Amino acid sequence: MYGPTVQRSANGGKTWERSKKIGLPAWSGLTVNATWHIEPGRPQEPATLYLGADPGVLFRSDDAGETWEPNLGILQHPTREHWFPGAGGLCCDSIQLDPRDPYRMYVCIASAGTLRSDDGGQTWLPVNKNVAHDYLPNPYPEIGQCVHKLLLHPARPERLWQQNHFGVYRSDDCGGSWERLDGNGLPGGFGFPIMIDPRPDRPAGGS
């Protein structure tokens, strides 16, 4: 459902109930406009869920989605004043958890780029090296990229793919640097969906 809400079911979808209000602290001056992405927690955390929302915020639930707490590392990120919404808003549209490192996770925000946490979400590092943004004076900024989708290789978590507003990229060093791939036969760089077939390591995207 589009909007600032989450519906959850405890019986396989026969009935649904709304989560308690998904809100932000008054001091932030922000309100939740829409929810964009829900990611389940790790197998050892079956009641944990992560939620990405507009305006570029991340939430965590440890009670199967009944209540949600905002991630302060994202909410108070020192670069936030330089984030700006794309056509769909300032949306946190991808969340990925490293299956080997219990403290490492990634979020993508359009238009802020990809951020990585190595301490369980307390702090976040922009990881956008070599990722272009054609509309900015600096074509390779530290932040500001419009990432539409991020995926992590399930068996090689150091490898990431992203479908960007301006291209398709791959990283082999946990987002430390990126290589652009859409010049290798794709009809265009713009798109939204991307998926991985890990055998034999074959990505597919739409443009």
Residue ranges and their predicted role:
Residues 1-207:
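Extracellular glycan-interacting surfaces
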